[in-house]
Structure formats: structure tokens, C-alpha cells
Amino acid sequence: MTKIKICGITNPDDAIASCTAGADALGFNFSKASPRYIQPETALSIIEKLPPFISCVGVFVEQEPHEVNQICNLCRLDHAQLHAERYTAEKAVAVRGAKVIRVFRTGPDFTIDVVRTFAEETGITSFLFDAYRPGQPGGTGHVIEQQLAQKIFRETEHIGFGILAGGLKPENVAEATSTVRPYAVDTASGVEESPGRKNHQKIRDFVSAVHRSAELL
């Protein structure tokens, strides 16, 4: 079954709604430039009240490894999702407060060799692939072209675990999941009323669509 991450959680109601709908993981965005930014102390207060067996993921863009470690330890995060090219192999292995998910944007110069080399240098095996938009480290709301996504995830199977992101919503996630076959899918804007505020019905519809896609495999 494809795992599901609901990202951009900013309040307890959205967190619990995501969990009860069937999400496997919640994402907390610690980039101050994001409209979904959440203070670490607020994230901790939400995480402490979550039901068991939910993975908590921190989204990092501008923090140095020691800052990532501090937030991971404070918030008891399971995973650190590292965006932007600033997170070289050397910096990624310096993150020890949580397991690392490295984000790659599928721009015009992207090749799977970049992922393979990164995995060999770091031992990291979890990768999130997002659509490329100049000047945006992630959360673009744009979909990765289907043939490109299929190629990326087919090749990623031999390297680690691939997470599909970029423009996923209840209306398109079933097809994306059944054709690309990612380990997990990730959405933020696809289930929102506005940045940082979720639509609980959209969350339920998104989760149902992912589960329904299993019938198409």
C-alpha cells in the first residue's frame, strides 16, 4: 500500500483530521519563508498529542545541520526532509537527529545519476521528487510530467524509496499512484482551503483515492 504524507500541518485540528483519515505521516514546515511555517514549539505541542504509529517529518530549507538537529530533537521528529541544493552529501550526513529524506527537483538538467551518487556518498535511501520551478525549493503545486516520473521512480527502485510530490490532489493522485508506483505520495496545497489551513474533506478524498489506486495495480 502506498504511504501517504500530508504536509504543511500548522494546527492540531488538521493534524488529527489527517491521522483519522488514514495518513501515515505529517509534515511540519520550518522554513520561515513558507506560508505554512510553524514554530518548533508549536509543532511539538501538536506532535505530543498525535495517535501512535504516525511518522512526523520536518521540512527544512535554510537551516544548517546543527539547527536541523536541534529542531529534530526538540520536536521528536522521525524524519528530516532536506530541500535545496545547500544540503550537499557532507551536510546531509551531519544531520543525525532524524532519518533524512533528500528532496530532488526534476529540472531540465536532472538525471537519476545525481540521486545514485548522493546515495552512494551518504547511505541515505529516501528521496522525494518534486516538480521544478525557478526560485522555489518545493511546494510548487506543479505536477511532474508523467513519463519523466515513471522513468525516475522505475530507476529509483534500485537505489531506495521514492516519494512523489508536486501538484497531487484528490482528482489526480489515484492515476499518478497507479502509473508511477511510488513508495509514498506527498501533498500540501492539494488538500488546502488556503496555505496552512486544510480542507478535511479533501484530506479524506485524497486518502481514499490513494487506497483506491491499489485496486488498479
Swiss-Prot record:
GO terms for biological process: L-tryptophan biosynthetic process. InterPro entries: Aldolase_TIM, PRAI_dom, RibuloseP-bd_barrel, TrpF_fam. It holds the Pfam family PRAI. GO terms for molecular function: phosphoribosylanthranilate isomerase activity. It catalyses: N-(5-phospho-beta-D-ribosyl)anthranilate = 1-(2-carboxyphenylamino)-1-deoxy-D-ribulose 5-phosphate. Transmembrane segments: none annotated. It comes from the Bacteria. Its EC number is 5.3.1.24. HAMAP family: PRAI. Belongs to the TrpF family. This is N-(5'-phosphoribosyl)anthranilate isomerase. The lineage of its organism: Bacteria, Pseudomonadati, Chlorobiota, Chlorobiia, Chlorobiales. The gene is trpF.
